[in-house]
Amino acid sequence: MLLNRLEKVLMNNPVRAAFQRHLEAPQLLRLGGPLAGGVALEVGCGRGVGIELILERFGAERVEAFDLDPQMVALARRRHASRGDAVRVSEGDASAIEAEDARYDAVFDFGILHHVPRWRDAIGEIHRVLKPGGRFFAEEVSERALENPVIRRLLDHPREDRFDFDEFCGELTARDFSLCGAREVLGLGGFVVAAKSA
């Protein structure tokens, strides 16, 4: 689901970037540890802040990333043009990832799957494209946060089949992931790292 105009502003500003750098990345690193090189995928890359973090903080050698919105793809490509072959950005859909099976050492979700109407399919696709033993790093917002009347009025999110944090983690284990670590935050969402069975 594409972001509305207000949510694009909220997700593509220095405050959101600082939140990713100083809260999300450190939490996910604590739960899942760094990568030892390898190729990572970011689903819903927006303007490309997550790509920087995956390379510089998590230690991926290369990042492939996609977004549903062509405008965000253009911004991310511009932001990372100097990185050459280390970054590839394209249009894509998390519920139908265009990659071969077992391609990635890690997949990153910085608050994207709650925008995906078929989020369960997206988890299945993430599992499919991860190598055995590969890790899925996710920061997600749960149903309770999205039910806030102000959020409901101003921002567009799928209304059907929303998840709470336990349900999100449960779907991961149902898809043959093992949880490396999880931290719920105030019942509004949280951080989870899960590994695909080897």
Briefly describe each language-model feature range:
Residues L2-H22:
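Class I SAM-dependent methyltransferase Rossmann-like catalytic core
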Residues A18, F137-V193:
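C-terminal alpha-helical "lid/dimerization" subdomain adjacent to the S-adenosyl-L-methionine
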Residues A18-G37:
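Conserved alpha-helix/loop element of class I SAM-dependent methyltransferases that forms part
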Residues L41, R47-A96:
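Class I SAM-dependent methyltransferase SAM/SAH-binding core
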Residues S95-A106:
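A short acidic, Gly/Pro-enriched loop at the edge of an enzyme's catalytic core
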Residues A106-P117:
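A short SAM/SAH-binding and catalytic strip from SAM-dependent methyltransferases
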Residues R120-P132:
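A short glycine-rich, Lys/Arg-flanked "PGG" loop and its adjoining helix->strand segment in the class I
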